[in-house]
Each structure stands twice: as C-alpha cells, then as structure tokens.
C-alpha cells in the first residue's frame, strides 16, 4: 500500500505547507501582496501582522488545531475531551494568530462548556482534513465525527457544512477521484446541514477561471467564501504547485485557503508530487512526518 501512504503523507504535508506558504500573505489584499513581496512562490518572512511573531516556513493556528485533532483520534473516532484539552493547552501558550471564534470557544471549553460559538468562520474546515483521511472509506462515520469535532468550537450550520465538504473532498482524493461530479455528491452529503451553502458549491461548475471565482466567492475568513474557493482551486488546476501558487497570492485568508487546498491536492497527487523545496523549507517537519504516519496507521489498520 505504498500509494495510500504517499497520498496520506501528501495530504498532511500539503495542508501544513499551504498553511506555512500562506502565512505571510494572510489578511492582505492581492495588491498588497504584490507590493510587499512581488509574486510569492516560496517561504518568505512575514511582513503582515505576523511580522516578528512567526518566521518563514512556520505554520499557524490552522495546523496547531489539526495537530490537536490528530493527537485525539483513534480508529473509533475523536476523543472530544482530549481534543478540548489539547486546544486549551495550545491557547494558554498565547499563540500570536489565534482566531477570535477559537479564543471564545476555547474559553468556554475551559469551563467544561462544549457548546461552541455560533460563528461561520472557517476554523472547523481548516483543521478537519485528518478525519477525511482516517474515515475515507466510511462516509456515514466521517459525517458523525466531523459534526462532533466542529461543534465544540464552531456550532454553526455553515461552518459545519464547510468542514464536511473539505473532509468529503479529501476522502474522495484518497480514492483517486477529482472531477465535477463530486460537487453533486457533496451537495447530497451536506444539504441536510446547510442547503444554501451546499447549493453555493454547485455554482463552481459555472466557472473555469480562478480569478473570477475568487472575486465571486471571496477568499475571506468566512466558510462560505474560503471553502468554495479552495474546492474550486483544487478542481480547476491539474498539479499541486499550480493551485498552491494561486491560493497564496489570492489575498484574504490565504493560509486557510492554501491549507485546505493542500489537504485535498496532496491527497490526490501524493507526497512525491509536492515540490521538494517546499518540503525542505518547512520548519519542524519531523513532527509532521510522525503525525502523518499516525494517520496512515489509523486509516489502514
């Protein structure tokens, strides 16, 4: 099963590399990115709000939360208490890039309140890919676990539907599927959670130009902007590098956009098709190798 291992490594590294490549351009417009960096195609020192807080090649809260998810997973599903405790420990280190929704939700978790926050930001979708890997062969179980893992911070129908969509596309990529018919299948998979958002994903079929897509859906932090844009980037490009470069130069919530794209594209193209310089330049990659191996064993045992 070399191929499956390569795909799972690809998904995990794709997500983390996307996060680290997109970190310096996060919260900037397309024009500001051009002015500050030119065209970004490698790791650069951040000149945005993370300047002096993170260094080039480092990841953000997107990956920190995904790591907590991976550490709390068993083949039976997610240990919610363990996941909550990991998020609390991470928050208490005062990370420079924690989102407001996550901060509020984790404060509630500290008081044993698991009801989450009613926010449609993409915090659930950005961390969800490990579930798409482990439960790629059981969509019913995948749905249950995604809802459970999302609700404790983002108790909002659009946030949950967006997380389900990303997990669905990751699971499909591991099965070598990447085509527009997946949009209809995804619609059927998530419409009971948020039909309006599910319909929005179907609109991706109307486009063949990513610049138009980013203008139409947006690339901001809201789930109904960044998730359709990430899925569209994945479906409309045909190699890992091309889609990644689009994401990190798009403006907006670039680290989440690129991370979600990377999780899907990495699962489809595999680790061997990720540019070597992006793997080499990633900080603390041995941690990511270990976590990817853990997911591989959970997904295949």
From Swiss-Prot:
Molecular-function GO terms, alphabetical: hydrolase activity
EC code(s) of this entry: 3.2.2.-
- Chaperone: present as a keyword of the record? no
Q: What is this protein called?
A: Uncharacterized protein MJ1187
| Source organism of the structure | Methanocaldococcus jannaschii (strain ATCC 43067 / DSM 2661 / JAL-1 / JCM 10045 / NBRC 100440)
**InterPro entries with a match to the protein in the record:** ADP-ribosylglycohydrolase (IPR050792), Ribosyl_crysJ1 (IPR005502), Ribosyl_crysJ1_sf (IPR036705)
For this UniProt record, give its keywords in alphabetical order, as a comma-separated list. Hydrolase
Family label: Belongs to the ADP-ribosylglycohydrolase family.
Q: What class of enzyme is it?
A: hydrolase
Instruction: Note the Pfam families from the entry.
Output: ADP_ribosyl_GH
């Amino acid at each position: 099963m070399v191929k499956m291992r390569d795909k799972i490594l690809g998904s995990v590294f794709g997500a983390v590399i996307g996060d680290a490549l997109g970190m310096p351009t996060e919260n900037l417009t397309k024009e500001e990115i051009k002015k500050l960096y030119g065209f970004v195609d490698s790791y650069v020192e951040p000149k945005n709000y993370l300047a002096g807080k993170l260094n080039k090649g480092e990841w953000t809260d997107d990956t920190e939360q995904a790591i907590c998810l991976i550490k709390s997973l068993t083949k039976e599903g997610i240990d919610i208490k363990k996941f909550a405790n990991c998020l609390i420990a991470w928050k208490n280190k005062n990370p420079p890039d924690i989102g407001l929704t996550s901060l509020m939700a984790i404060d509630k978790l500290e008081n044993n309140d698991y009801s989450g926050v009613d926010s449609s930001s993409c915090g659930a979708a950005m961390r969800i890919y490990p579930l798409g890997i482990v439960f790629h062969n059981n969509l019913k179980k995948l749905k249950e676990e995604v809802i459970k893992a999302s609700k404790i911070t983002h108790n909002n129908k659009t946030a949950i539907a967006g997380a389900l969509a990303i997990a669905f596309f990751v699971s499909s990529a591991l099965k070598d599927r990447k085509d527009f018919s997946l949009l209809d299948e995804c619609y059927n998979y998530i419409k009971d959670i948020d039909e309006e958002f599910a319909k929005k994903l179907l609109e991706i079929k109307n486009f063949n130009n990513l610049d138009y897509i980013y203008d139409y859906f947006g690339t901001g932090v809201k789930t109904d902007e960044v998730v359709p844009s990430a899925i569209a980037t994945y479906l409309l490009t045909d190699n890992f590098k091309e889609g990644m470069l689009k994401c990190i130069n798009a403006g907006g919530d670039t680290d989440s956009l690129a991370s979600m794209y990377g999780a899907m594209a990495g699962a489809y193209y595999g680790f061997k098709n990720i540019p070597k310089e992006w793997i080499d330049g990633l900080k603390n990659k041995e941690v990511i190798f270990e976590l990817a191996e853990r997911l591989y064993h959970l997904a295949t045992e």
